[in-house]
């Protein structure tokens, strides 16, 4: 199977050909990782089987539609996508952009667990490696290996991850907390339990919409930040990588699409740095801060932004 966003190229020795541009972008595929003709480990088959299952489940959506089922999916989108992944997995855990009381942190994290994007230790580790090695051969999901790989192909390629990060030593802050180790060891039971509860609550329609539709919707929105936001959009800051600000991804992902801003100031709890850059996650963080639940909220100072903008201007002149 070929990357549909890349002009067809001949394969060579089991590797996909490099140095092809992704359509409608200036991103050149320089990596040679073969997405299909490689060794598939047991975990790769398991992850691919699960992802296939939820996509097939979602195909029943037109035949099981009710407004109640749709509402379950929409609320699930907000809880797992906005609260769980964007605000908690990403801005809180991966970047320490803010602090929450432990009871609230763990509650919000659990919504992220139900997004079925792996346990917090795995997710945060991969994301921190992404920032450490962004758009290099050691990046976890860069489009230099093609759109498909950066979007979701990397999820099915544990060999690629093991080759580069055999020991995940960048999440010791999470490993020392029993809650996160418990979630890691019992992860799939929480996903299966969620599915069972949805079925018991509303039958097959709730399972289709609350598990299938909601899960793949949040999947692909999250994955678009990894793929589209490193391919299409604009760069306000010279970050030395492919990160882009993409307005339509930002609208769908509660502010995550202001990705070039994020790579310029990865510690910032605010991604939409301009007044017109809608960042729903930031608005929620500000609310939590106003009522005393969010503390140590980090944002770049005007001096830091000026320094970065000056650096960007100087590099543009060279």
Model-derived regions: residue spans:
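Non-catalytic, topology-defining segments of multipass membrane proteins
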Residues: 1-223, 228, 268-318
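Active-site-proximal inter-transmembrane loops
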Residues: 171-178, 232-258, 264-265
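Asparagine-centered polar/low-complexity signal
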Residues: 226, 260-261
């Amino acid at each position: 199977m070929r990357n549909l966003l890349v002009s067809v190229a001949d394969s060579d020795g089991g590797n996909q050909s490099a140095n092809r541009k992704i359509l409608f972008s200036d991103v050149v595929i320089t990596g040679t990782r073969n997405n299909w003709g490689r060794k598939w480990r047991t975990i790769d088959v398991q992850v691919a089987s699960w992802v296939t299952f939820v996509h097939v489940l979602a195909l029943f959506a037109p035949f099981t539609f009710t407004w109640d089922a749709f509402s379950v999916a929409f609320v699930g989108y907000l809880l797992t996508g906005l609260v769980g992944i964007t605000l908690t997995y990403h801005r809180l855990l991966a970047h320490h952009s803010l602090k929450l009381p432990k009871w609230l942190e763990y509650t919000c994290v659990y919504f992220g667990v139900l997004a079925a994007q792996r346990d917090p230790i795995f997710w945060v580790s991969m994301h921190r490696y992404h920032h450490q090695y962004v758009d290099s051969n050691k990046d976890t999901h860069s489009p230099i290996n093609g759109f498909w790989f950066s979007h979701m192909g990397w999820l099915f390629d544990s060999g690629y991850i093991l080759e580069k990060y055999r020991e995940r030593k960048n999440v010791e802050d999470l490993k020392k907390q029993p809650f996160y180790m418990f979630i890691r060891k019992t992860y799939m039971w929480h996903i299966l339990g969620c599915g069972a509860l949805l079925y018991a609550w509303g039958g097959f329609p709730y399972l289709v919409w609350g598990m299938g539709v909601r899960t793949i919707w949040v999947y692909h929105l999250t994955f678009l930040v990894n793929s589209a936001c490193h391919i299409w959009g604009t760069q306000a800051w010279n970050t030395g990588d492919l990160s882009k600000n993409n307005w339509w991804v930002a609208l769908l992902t509660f502010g995550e699409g202001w990705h070039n801003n994020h790579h310029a100031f990865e510690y910032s709890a605010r991604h939409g740095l301009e007044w017109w850059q809608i960042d729903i996650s930031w608005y929620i963080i500000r609310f939590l801060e106003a009522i005393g639940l969010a503390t140590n909220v980090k944002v770049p100072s005007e001096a830091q932004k000026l320094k970065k903008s000056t650096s960007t201007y100087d590099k543009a002149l060279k």
